[in-house]
A protein has these predicted regions:
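N-terminal helicase ATP-binding lobe
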Residues: 1-772
Length: 772
């Protein structure tokens, strides 16, 4: 029952249309107009009180009352509404900043009552306090907290840890960046607790806090057959819903923990789930759900057209109002900038290109010279951000090494003079940036719920009610949709994407075949084609769900080669896995007693076990592994693993640049068709291929090659850590490599001291530096 159509019908009333246009475009209302529109708002609030499903009625009334406060400086209606619906932080802010000229005795009494909602140096909303209390006191094993972005999910996590202090606790997060941020936050609150963020840091503790991605959680379970988490907190739980591999293994990690401990408590936190049944993993699973349906923030939406006209959009009336004209998108962004500006694009290459173009129009800031020197000294003098950061701009995308990405994120958060962040979807998963205005330059593949999540990052609540603010303008964040053919594509007007925001209700799209309520019947019933031999009988695993059941319910049995391969998702690289599995099983038995095998390095072992003679099966689904047929490729990756652990970032980049120079000097064909991946590719690998995955290094300047080397380094590091590591884990599980070989691949050393330092949280590069 959205109600948006009922509101749109009021457009036919001229005074109503005129007043809404004024409120949308920031024009003060006359006394008669105020009286009329506030009366209309009261009617909508009364209808909402009759039926709480009519959330759009409340949202519209709140929009009007908030705008009246911000434009006409008439705060009494907002004060009264906030008191009635429990938006108590607004009441406290209005009272402390004296935004109402004279408070009645009743208002003073109400402020004293509001103080009862003080929690950890801030005032909570009524629903926020109620939900937090009920979630924490819940005896249910499965608890779901659904609330808009920045509505206290982090503080709820800390509370869950406090009431389970001496237990085994794990927070499951979707990205390595969130691991880093979570560790920093947890260390501040729980300085004496051991925090595990790598599966190898566990040392048989009875009580700990861990922060894992789903991949690390499963590796933790694989290495510790009996361990379980008493409490599992799944952050950004909407990541269970899509049809992708990471969603499937997230479901696997949750189910495995519950299988190992039937009394484990699970908490699911998300701003984007519509109803908890979408998360259902088992038929008997019952959720205790608490949800905040009302959003205290009401964004303003702007659209810049490529010809220069710009408009303001009212989502309730589905109307756009022309505001003016600007010469180009760069001038438009500069005209609408605030202290912290976030520009969103999709492609890593476009992220860099836009950063370059905007920086040409920005002036130098001498205060940032020292930061620029840090990047130059520790990364490379030709890294684009060395120049850009001096103008108050940084960019982020998946091709930047994690260490540098973490550093840049931290500096954007803490350094006031860095005003521009240009990035893609790497920021979608919970990173708490201090963003004051959002410019969206591309909406390709940006689903409506991800768009809402992105918008929710602007003006987090702790920034809205900061004592540094003199008003409540941050309750009304600015979101700009900026059209440009180069950055968004031809004939892709963002107006149509913006119109989707007029609704307040969005159904869950449950596509993960491991979930019970998946809507994707085709995937749900798709035959995996895997046969399992158990108790001398052959059993066909026909669906993804059956495959997951096989992995979960056989959890405590000895690891077979088959199960280990499936756990690592290596079965999916082969076209006919059943035939391949029989050959792999024979190789395992043969290599266990082979002197030839013992003399191979670990990369050669990967080749001889998983790749050799499987060209037909690999070329259909996993062509990237066929290059290991070449001895030089295997030699390259053997050396790369060593450099990855022992060289600094700067040394490694210089090594790659020397490699590029060598390719050029020796006229190697690879120099003019170098594989860099789809994100930065400009030409296809072979004629007729539609995918541009290669570059011609001979056409690139020294500076361009240095930045491509950075991407190259990140790509290769990810390939080792995600693709080759799966092979290494399997070989180790089935005892085809020694612990020393495993340690050298993972830690870069056989020395126990180095391994212990790594388990304490130090990187292999830092360990090498400290021991140099």
């Amino acid at each position: 029952m959205d109600g948006i159509n009922q509101i749109k019908k009021l457009k036919d009333i001229d005074p109503f249309q005129i007043i809404i246009r004024k409120l949308t475009t920031g024009v003060q209302l006359e006394y008669e107009e105020l009286s009329f529109i506030l009366s209309v708002s009261i009617l909508f609030l009364q209808e909402y009180q009759k039926d709480k499903r009519r959330i759009t009625y409340f949202n519209f009334a709140y929009f009007v009352i908030l705008k009246v406060a911000l434009i006409n400086k008439l705060y009494q209606p907002l004060f009264d509404l906030s008191l009635n619906v429990g938006f108590y932080p607004i009441n406290r802010f209005i009272y402390e900043k004296k935004l109402i000229e004279s408070f009645s005795l009743e208002s003073i009494k109400n402020d004293v009552e509001v103080d009862a909602y003080r929690y950890d140096k801030h005032i909570e909303m009524y629903q926020q306090r109620l939900n937090r209390t009920e979630i924490l006191s819940s005896e249910s094993l499965d608890n779901v907290y659904i609330a808009p972005t920045s509505f206290g999910k982090s503080s709820l996590i800390f509370d869950i840890i406090r009431i389970n202090y001496n237990k085994k606790i794990s927070i499951i997060v979707p990205s390595k960046s969130l691991i880093s941020q979570s560790i920093i936050d947890l260390k501040k609150i729980f300085p004496d607790r051991k925090i595990i963020f790598n599966e190898d840091m566990y040392d048989n503790e009875e009580s700990f806090i861990s922060v894992f991605t789903q991949e690390r959680a499963l590796r933790f379970f694989s290495k510790n057959k009996k361990i379980y988490f008493d409490v599992m907190i799944v952050d950004e739980a909407h990541n269970l819903l899509p049809n992708d591999y990471r969603a499937v293994i997230l479901a696997r990690a949750i189910r495995r923990n519950r299988f190992r401990s039937s009394n484990s408590k699970h908490y699911y936190l998300s701003p984007l789930i519509n109803e908890s049944k979408s998360l259902q993993l088992e038929a008997n699973q019952v959720f205790f759900e608490r949800k905040i349906k009302l959003n205290i923030k009401e964004p303003d939406y702007f659209e810049f057209k490529e010809m220069g006209d710009f408009f303001k959009y009212n989502r309730f009336l589905d109307e756009s109002y022309r505001l003016g004209w600007c010469e180009n998108l760069y001038e438009y962004i500069k005209y609408n900038q605030k202290n912290k500006n976030f520009i969103y694009l999709r492609s890593p290459k476009k992220v860099e290109e836009f950063s370059k173009r905007l920086c040409h129009r920005l002036g130098l800031n001498e205060k940032l010279a020292s930061l620029s020197k840090i990047l130059s000294d520790n990364l490379h003098e030709d890294f684009y951000c060395v120049d850009y950061i001096k103008k108050g701009l940084i960019y982020l995308h998946g091709g930047i090494p994690d260490l540098i990405k973490d550093f840049l994120e931290y500096k954007f958060e803490t350094e006031a003079d860095i005003k521009y962040l240009v990035a893609n979807s790497v920021v979608l998963e919970g990173i708490n940036f201090p963003i004051e205005v959002l410019f969206i330059l591309n909406t390709t593949d940006l689903r409506i719920k991800n768009l809402i999540n992105l918008i929710g990052r602007v003006n987090r609540l702790n920034e809205v009610f900061s004592n540094d603010n003199d008003d409540l303008l941050k309750l009304n964040p600015n979101v700009h949709f900026v059209n440009d053919t180069y950055f968004n594509g031809k004939n892709r007007d963002m107006y149509h994407k913006m119109k989707l925001l007029k609704s307040s209700l969005f159904e869950d799209s449950v596509e993960n075949p491991a979930l019970l309520n998946t809507i994707n019947d085709q995937l749900k019933n798709k035959n995996t084609g895997i046969n399992v031999v158990q108790d001398n009988s052959t059993e066909n695993i026909s669906t993804v769900r059956e495959l997951e059941d096989f992995l979960i319910y056989d959890d405590q049995k000895d690891n077979s080669l088959l199960k280990t391969i499936i756990e690592q998702d290596v079965h999916n690289i082969y076209n006919e896995f059943n035939q391949v599995h029989e050959i792999l099983f024979g190789r395992m038995e043969r290599y266990l007693i082979s002197s030839f095998w013992m003399g191979l390095n670990i990369i050669d072992k990967i080749y001889y076990f998983f790749i050799k003679d499987f060209d037909y099966d690999l070329k259909i689904k996993s062509k990237k592994f066929l290059r290991f047929n070449y001895k030089n490729t295997r030699k390259y990756y053997n050396n790369f693993v060593y450099r990855m652990h022992n060289l600094s970032l700067k040394s490694h980049i210089n090594h790659i640049l020397k490699y590029y120079d060598w390719l050029g000097r020796n006229n190697i064909s690879k120099y003019k068709k170098f594989y860099i991946g789809a994100g930065f590719g400009e030409i296809p690998y072979w004629s007729g291929n539609k995918n541009n995955t290669c570059i011609d290094l001979s056409l690139k300047s020294r500076k361009q090659r240095a930045n491509l080397a950075l991407v190259h380094l990140k790509n290769e590091t990810d390939f080792v850590n995600f693709d080759l590591l799966k092979f290494v884990n399997i070989l180790y599980e089935v005892k085809l490599i020694t612990e020393a070989e495993y340690n050298c691949f993972i830690y870069g050393s056989e020395q126990r001291e180095n391994i212990n330092l790594f388990k304490a949280g130090l990187s292999t590069q830092l360990i090498s530096f400290l021991k140099a």
